[in-house]
Each structure stands twice: as structure tokens, then as C-alpha cells.
């Protein structure tokens, strides 16, 4: 089983009950973090931005890690995200093929860091979804939908026809080019 750096958490929290509001609204968020502590921190960060609820006046109700139902089947994942670059905020849609959503999210973080120089704190995942093959948009994920796909054999190692011709030290370096 592959261990991923980012785990998906479901965090549930609310503002503290007061005399004016005895039953405050409960908020639930699904987010990715390396551990539970960072997931809680991210939850309060988003809640402070979206609603008038701060950690000092808030209450954490539950935090659960979400696991994939069948992590052996390859699926197409779509990720809608918002990221902060040197020029401002941008919205983006990305597609990945992976066995788990955590794997697809990790691919996304690696790609965003390499292509756009955007690190983990500057990326906000808006939505994720499993996408059927006919609704895929990106060519990078569509190329694997062909059932007759072939991969080229890049290097060919020539083996000796008999054990007698097998030597540990060759007089000349073998040519592996096809």
C-alpha cells in the first residue's frame, strides 16, 4: 500500500454557543493536510475567511480521515482549484488519472510546484470529482482511454544465445540503441 503525504480529512466545527445564539450553525469541510493538526488549522483559516467564526470563539466537533472505497481501480479525477501567484489569484481545472483521490491531489501539488512555482499554502482546492471517460477534457488523461494502447520498448538488452558465451567482462561496451 502506498503512503501519501497528503490525507483527506473531514472536519466539523461551529462557533461557541452564546446567549443570543444557543444553537450555532455547524460547518463541515473536506480538506487535505499532512496531519490532523494541520487539517484543523486549515479549517479555522477557511472558516475565518468565509464566515465570522474564529478558533478562539469556536468549537471543534469532529475530525475524521476519509479513505478511498476501492483504492485498486484506476479512475479519472478532476480538481478545481484557486491559487495565489506573484501576479494575483487564478482559478484552474486539472485532470489526473490515479487509483486514489489522495494520489491525484499529491500529483496536483507536485505539478503546481514544478510548473507554476506555487507551493502548498497558496493552493486552495475548491472541488474534486471522479469523472467518467467521456467527460474528460485534457489530452494527458484522454490518451490512456484507448484499449489498444502500446508502449515502445526503449532499450533492448541482447542476451547471449548460450551460457558458454556469457562473460562478466566484455571486450567492448554493448550497444543498447535500437
Curated annotation (Swiss-Prot):
GO molecular function: structural constituent of ribosome
Pfam families: Ribosomal_L18A (PF01775)
Keyword Mitochondrion applies: no
Gene3D superfamilies: 3.10.20.10
Any GO BP: translation
Domain of life the protein comes from: Eukaryota
GO cellular component: ribonucleoprotein complex; ribosome
Expression induction: By wounding.
Alphabetic keyword roster: Ribonucleoprotein, Ribosomal protein
Keyword Kinase: no
Matching InterPro entries: Ribosomal_eL20, Ribosomal_eL20_dom, Ribosomal_eL20_eukaryotes
Family: Belongs to the eukaryotic ribosomal protein eL20 family.
Protein name (Swiss-Prot/TrEMBL): Large ribosomal subunit protein eL20
Lineage of the species this protein comes from: Eukaryota, Viridiplantae, Streptophyta, Embryophyta, Tracheophyta
Amino acid at each position: 500500500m502506498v503512503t501519501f503525504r497528503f490525507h483527506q480529512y473531514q472536519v466539523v466545527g461551529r462557533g461557541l454557543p452564546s446567549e443570543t445564539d444557543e444553537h450555532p450553525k455547524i460547518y463541515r469541510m473536506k480538506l487535505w493536510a499532512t496531519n490532523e493538526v494541520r487539517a484543523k488549522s486549515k479549517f479555522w483559516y477557511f472558516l475565518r475567511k468565509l464566515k465570522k467564526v474564529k478558533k478562539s470563539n469556536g468549537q471543534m466537533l469532529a475530525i475524521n480521515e476519509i479513505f478511498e472505497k476501492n483504492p485498486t481501480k484506476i479512475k479519472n479525477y478532476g480538481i478545481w482549484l484557486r491559487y495565489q501567484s506573484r501576479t494575483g489569484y487564478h482559478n484552474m481545472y486539472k485532470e489526473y488519472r490515479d487509483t486514489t483521490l489522495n494520489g491525484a491531489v499529491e500529483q496536483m501539488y507536485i505539478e503546481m510546484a514544478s510548473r507554476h512555482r506555487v507551493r502548498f499554502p497558496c493552493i486552495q482546492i475548491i472541488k474534486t470529482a471522479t469523472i467518467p471517460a467521456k467527460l474528460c477534457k485534457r489530452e494527458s488523461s484522454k490518451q490512456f482511454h484507448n484499449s489498444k494502447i502500446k508502449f515502445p520498448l526503449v532499450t533492448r538488452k541482447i542476451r547471449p544465445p548460450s551460457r558458454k558465451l556469457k562473460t562478466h567482462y566484455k571486450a567492448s561496451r554493448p550497444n543498447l540503441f535500437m
